[in-house]
Amino acid sequence: MVGRLVPSRIRPIAVAAILLATAVWIQTRQWPDVAHAQQGGAASARRTLVLDRPPVRLLSDPNPVFRAVAIDTEKGEVFMANDKESSGASILVYPTQFAPTDRIMEPRRRIAGPNTDIGMVCGIALSPQHGEMYTISGETGTLNVFSMQANGDVPPARQLGGIIPRANAGVYLDAAHDELFITTEHVNRIAVYRRTFQEKDEPLRIIQGPSTGLADPHGIYVDSEANEIYVTNHGNWRATVTGEGEVRGPDSLTRTSLGYNVPGRVLPLGPSTGKFLPASITVYSRTANGDPAPVRVIQGPRTQLDQPDGITQDPVSGEIVIANTGNDSILFFARNAAGDVPPVRVLQGAATKLKGPVGVSIDRGHNELWVASWDNHIAAVFPRTVQGNVAPLRIIRTAPENAPLASMGRIGAVAYDAKRDEILVPN
C-alpha cells in the first residue's frame, strides 16, 4: 500500500531500490570525510551514541485498519485483521448485525498483545466446525491457530513456524479436504498444509516455479466442488526455483540469509529476472504440485484488475469476487472466466465509500457482501447482488469519518529529499 499515490504506477520495490541507490551515492560521494575518519582507526576515537529519548515529531496513524475479513454465519460474527503496526496489530471481532451508525464501534473481542505473536496479520480463515481461527503474519512467517472465542493477549493454541517463508499474504481453509492454503508474495508460492498441522510440519504440496505464472500472489480461494484454486496476483514477477524460500536450515533454498539462523544453500542474486506483469487471477487444479501451468488466467486491460487482493466466491451465483485495491472497486467475474474478459458487474464510485479495498467475504445467512476498506478505516456492508455506485447498508468504523487516510503500511525504508524538502517512504 503506497500512500494514496497510484499503487499501480509506483511500485514499492522500485522505490526501495531507488532509495537504496541514493543512500549508497550519498555515502560514497557526499561524505568521504566520514569514510576517511573511519579508516583512521586510532586517529579517530569511536563512541557509542545511545538515543534514549522521545522523538521530536511522530508521523503515525494510531487508528486500526481492516486488512482481511472472515464471517462466522452460525454465530453472527465477523472477524477482521488489523495489520497496522502503529495501532498494534490485532484481530477484531464484531457482530454482523447492528444498527447503522457513523460512530466508532468497539469490538466484542480483541486478540492483541505480545503473547499472541500475530505480527503483521494479513489473513484470516475460520473453522466453525472445530472452533478454530487460522491467521498468518507477513513479517514473522507464522501460521497461528486461536480459539474462535479467544480474547485478549493470549498465546496461539498451535503455531506453524520456521517452515513458512516471510511475506505471507493470504490463507484459505478448504474444509471439505481439511487443508490450509497459504500464499507467499516474494517467492511466488502457494503452500498446502494439513489443518491439523503440528509445529515444523512440511507442506503437503507447493505450487512454485516459472511455469506457474504466480507474480506477487495475495488472495487465495479454493473451490472444493470444482477442485480449483483461485489466486490474485499483483504482477511483480521474478524467476523462482521450486522449493525456494523454505526455512529448513541447511536444506533451505534462499537468495538471502536475512532472518535465517542457518541460511542453507544461498542462490545467486543476479542476473536479475524481475519484471512487472499485468495483474491477474490464476487458476490451478486443487491437487497441483510442483511447477504446474495454470489451467486458465484472467488478465488484460478489459479485466480492470489493478492490485487485486482479497478473493471469495458468491455461494449463489458462483461468481468470483475480487477486492480491487488499485482503483477502489469490487469486481465480479464469471466462475469459468478466462483471458482478457470484463467483469460481469462492478461495485465502484464515491457513494460506496471504498478506499483501498483489500478483503471480501459473503455472509450467506443474510445475503450480504462485506468489504474491508483499508485506507479509510472502515468495513462496509452491501447487498450480495450489489452493482454500480451504491452506498453501503451500514459501516463499521475504527476512526472518525474525517480522519486522514491510513496511507502508511509496512514501511521498508525512509529517505530525505533535500532539494524538495520531502520525506520519501515506500510501503
Each language-model region and where it sits:
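Structural motif
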Residues: 87-93, 142-145, 189-193, 239-245, ...
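Short loop/turn segments immediately following beta-strands, especially the blade-tip
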Residues: 94-102, 145-153, 192-200, 283-291, ...
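A short helix->beta-strand "capping" segment at the edge of beta-propeller domains
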Residues: 40-63, 104-108, 291-296, 344
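Conserved beta-strand positions in repeat-built beta-propeller and related beta-rich domains
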Residues: 71-73, 80-87, 126-128, 133-141, ...
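Short, conserved, GDST-rich strand-edge loop motifs in beta-rich repeat architectures
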Residues: 232-276, 382
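Sequence/structural signature of beta-propeller modules
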Residues: 2-49, 256-269, 274-277
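Beta-rich, blade/repeat-based domains predominating
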Residues: 61-74, 114-130, 162-179, 211-225, ...
